[in-house]
Amino acid sequence: MNTRASKRPTALLPAKGWLAALAALVATSLVLAPGTAAARQGTVWLCKPGLEHNPCGPSLATTRLSNDGQTVEGKYTPPKIRRPAIDCFYLYPTVSDDQTDNSDLSIDPEERSIALYQAARYSQRCRVFAPMYRQITLKRLLQGNDTITPKMQRIAYQSALAGWKDYLNNFNHGRPFVLIGHSQGSFLLRKLIAEQIDSNANLRHRLVSAILLGGNVLVKKHRATGGDFKNIPACHSDTQLHCVIAFSTFNEPPPQDAVFGRVNGSLGSPVDPTLKVLCAYPGNSHLKTVLPTAPFAPGTTIGAATNLIGFAQPNATTAWAEFDHAYTGACSSAAGANVLQIAGNPGAPHLRSVPDATWGLHLTDANIALGNLTHIVKREQQAFFQR
């Protein structure tokens, strides 16, 4: 684990400072102009089968809890498939506290934590691959979006693309795969899918689904495709294949200037009346919220922000806590915003928007329905091999 002296987490700034960083978490990966790759360096794998320290391969022992997190309702360990027939390729969101414009490829506590929180649970269904990539850092975002250059954007995308190509050429061996991203990771996967997969019939056939959370995937109004992708539609059932699951989570009506769910020019999105932001969630409306019981890496920006959300503190000794009936949710297009609108059931904590209402529950996107999403991947896998 890296302990470089040059690393000074932005979480040590005053509250307004790191909240300002959060307010720009994903704004940098949207306008990704083509260009030359960053200096070549071999892929550093955050998650890969066989790694000695693999945050995507922990115990899956789980405690089912009451809505307030205090009463144990049961314990179980989901069985892992010994030889998974599919892979999951994951790009993590903006988490790096490196003190540079683009992160390096050293694995730090914040990357380990985010992989555990967002990707590890899929290991019961698939082999999980997650490359480190040179994302635009929180430190750079603190300087303001207008200071982010096309070069920084190219470095982030080309680094992620290099990880994808390494996986595809050296580890995939023709296997079906699921793509998983959140925030900056989703924006990068939008571009990668559009350029590398959408027009490639072979790869499109092997794409089980793409789970692109908190990333404002664009589609044509009144159509299943168009917008970001010409050939890959939205997922409308949990057995549909070669399609996209996408949503951003809110528990209050999204404001007119909401960062997610609207084609309003925020985060660099086009102001185009023929497009809409996709909300496609083919899971059960009774959300299975799943979280690690270990806290997010202390002393990091995202760790500090996560503490503000308000999830129940779990009374559990297992690696995971599951809240089976704390929240319900479904896609909503009320007031022109396409989002996953959730509501708390009795006893469930009211979750807070961080940094403000325009962001909704962005920091919960990957976990609020994680149990449902892993079940969808199971159903999709069954459908893929039963064709």
Range-by-range predicted roles:
Residues 1-15:
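N-terminal secretory signal peptides that target proteins for export/translocation
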Residues 18-31:
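Bacterial N-terminal signal peptides
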Residues 33-36:
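N-terminal signal peptide c-region/cleavage motif recognized by signal peptidases
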Residues 49-52, 81-84, 90-176, 337-387:
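Active-site catalytic motif of lipid deacylating hydrolases and related acyltransferases
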Residues 159-174, 194-350, 378-379, 383:
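Surface cap/lid and interfacial helix-loop subdomains adjacent to catalytic sites
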Residues 181-185, 189:
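Gly/Ala-rich beta-loop-alpha elbow adjacent to hydrolase catalytic centers
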